[in-house]
Amino acid sequence: MKAAPPTSLQALIEALRVLPGVGPKSAQRMAYHLLQHDREGARKLGDALRGAADHIRHCARCNTFTEQEICETCLDDRRDGSILCVVETPADQIMIEQTLTYRGKYFVLMGRLSPLDGIGPKEIHLDRLLARATDTEMGGPVGEVIVATNFTSEGEATAHYIGEMLKARGLKVSRLARGVPVGGELEYVDAGTIARAVMDRRNL
């Protein structure tokens, strides 16, 4: 009879597999490492995951992660409310913030269009983006929307869809310049390249 890990250990391995890029073997190595070498780290990890899952929500205006109803960026009156930058993920938002060149507001899609995966306009909250860009109660109307989706095929398709949707409402829409490589994702691009792409953005 084949020996199996204890039930609680197997549950940990399966839980670790939800992480991107983590397969069965990687999850098993992580689980064994935590239990063999870093029990205190394992407890801290569990507490941090539980705390984040219980307290992190989506900002009512920009859809990013926050512990409040409205995030600090949206509440910051020093930022330029006439410019709205649309990104795929909170990680992309952080990358643009690190350039120290953009002082407008954001909207975070939490994804990108991918019909083959069942991800359409509703799943990436384009109805909320439209409201954010045009509704005065949500902080609109804005003077310009910068589409900063990634330069993957899905990101380009998402940018095109957003551009057509917002231009139909009379809004100015621009796209990051091609300083970001084709197929590139903002999360993995250096801050200087992103800064140049923002400054050299082009109209859609």
Swiss-Prot record:
GO terms for molecular function: DNA binding; zinc ion binding. A zinc finger (C4-type) spans 59-74. Keywords: DNA damage, DNA recombination, DNA repair, Metal-binding, Zinc, Zinc-finger. It comes from the Bacteria. Gene3D superfamilies: 3.40.1360.10, 6.10.250.240, RecR Domain 1. SMART domains: TOPRIM. The keyword Zinc-finger applies. GO terms for biological process: DNA recombination; DNA repair. NCBIfam families: recR. Belongs to the RecR family. May play a role in DNA repair. It seems to be involved in an RecBC-independent recombinational process of DNA repair. It may act with RecF and RecO. PANTHER family: RECOMBINATION PROTEIN RECR. This is Recombination protein RecR.
